[in-house]
Amino acid sequence: MRVRGLCTLLSIVMLTAGATQAAAEPRHARNDEAIDYHEWSSGSFFAGRLDGLGFGYGGLRITHPAGSVAHTEPGLGTTRTYDYGTWTSPKYRQGFDATQLIASWNARTPAKTWLEVQARGRTSAGAETTWYTMGRWASGDADIHRTSVDGQSDANASVDVDTLATKAGVTLRSYQLRVTLYREQGSPTTPTLSSLGAMTSNVPDRFDVQTTKPGRARGIELKVPPFAQNIHKGQFPQYGGGGEAWCSPTSTEMVAEYWGRKPSAQQMDWIPADYQDRSIVYAARNTFDYAYDGTGNWPFNTAYAASLGLRGHITRLHDLNELEGYIARGIPVITSQSFLSSELDGAGYGTAGHLMVVVGFTQAGDVIANDPASSSDGRVRTVYKRDQFEKIWQRTKRHTESGAVAGGPGGVVYLITP
C-alpha cells in the first residue's frame, strides 16, 4: 500500500511498443520480471473508439459532445453541467500476465475543463474487469479538485492512489484505457489530450537485487538545478502538510526547469514575491491530490510537467544500467525509493517513500542524485553508493524499523522530456 504523507522523512540528523518518448536502448529483463510501457498519441489515436471527440491542434478535443452530465464538486461546493466526449483504446496485450498497471496522460485543461482516466483488463482466466478510475484531473484547482478515487476494490483488483494492483491469483493478460474529456456546458474551450499510456508490470517479491556493474554513464553529471524541499517545511500546509512532504513536486520541478520550463510570474502571483523558490510551492499546489491528501500521486506529477509544455509518463526500469542510458543521452530520471536510515549512507534519514532525481554517475559508478530532502539548495547534490541505491529503488519488499514487512517501489521512475 502507498504510504500517505509520502516523503515525510524520519530524520536522524535533522520499452515499449507504441511509446515514442525517450525510449532507452532495448534491454533484456531479469528472468523474474516483466515491464512494459505502451502509449497512444497522435496518429495512434485512430486505433481507438471516439464518441464526441475529434482530432484538433495538439490532440483529441471535444467536437460534438456525446452528452452532458451534472457534476458536484464537494470541496468547492459547486454543481455544474458539463458536456463530455470519450476515447476508448483498443485492447492492448503486453505479452505477459501483469500484476500492476499505472496510467499516465499528457493534456491541456484550460479553465472550465477537466478529464477522467479509467482502465480495465482481461484476466488470464478470461474474465473482463470493471472500469477502474485512475484519476480525475485538471491542471488547476478552480473547477474541480484533482483526485484519485478511494474505495475501488473487488475480486479482481484494487486501486491504491494511482496503482491498479491485481488480487492474489489474478493477473491481467491485456487492458484498455478510456479517457473522458469534460467542458462546462456553454463554454467554447475544450481540454486537449495529447497522449495516454500505461505501464504494466509483473515484478516478484524481492528484498534484494543484484548490483549492476557501472556502465556508459560513468563520469557524466547533468546540470539539473537543485531545489530543497525542507526550505518549505511547515509552509503552505494545505498542500499535504508543507514542504517536508514535497519530495515529488520538488523533484518534478527540478527536471522541468532543467528543460527550461517553469510557471510564469503571473501564474505564481498568489505566492509572496520575496518567497524563496516560489516554483516549488506552485508545483506542490498543482500536483496535490485531494483524496490522497498529498503531492505524491505519480501520474499527477508527470501530468503537471506536461502542463508546462513537456512530456512525461510513469514506468519502471530494470536496473541502473538501463537508467544510465537516459543519463548518457542528457535525460535526468526521477526515482522512487524507501529505506531505513541505516540502508543509505549519507542520507541521514529514513523514509517510507521518497522521490529524488538521478543526475549522473561518478567515475566509480556511484549515483549522483539531487535529493530534495535537504536543508538548503546548496546541499541537494548527494553521492550515494551504487549497491545501496539500486537495492532501495529496485526491491519490492523491505523490513521496517519494527521488523514488519512493507512494500518497495520496484524500480518506479518518472520520465520527463521536451
Language-model regions: role of each:
Residues 34-75, 93-96, 128-131, 169-226, ...:
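Noncatalytic regulatory segments and standalone regulatory/sensor domains
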Residues 113, 247, 354:
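Histidine-centered active-site/metal-ligand motif
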Residues 273-418:
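Conserved active-site-adjacent core of cysteine acyl-enzyme catalytic domains
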Residues 180-294:
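Active-site-adjacent structural segments surrounding the nucleophilic cysteine of cysteine proteases
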Residues 29-54, 79-99, 107-194:
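Beta-sandwich interaction modules
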Residues 1-25:
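Secretory targeting and sorting signals
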Residues 69-84, 313-317:
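Extracellular beta-rich ligand/substrate-recognition surface
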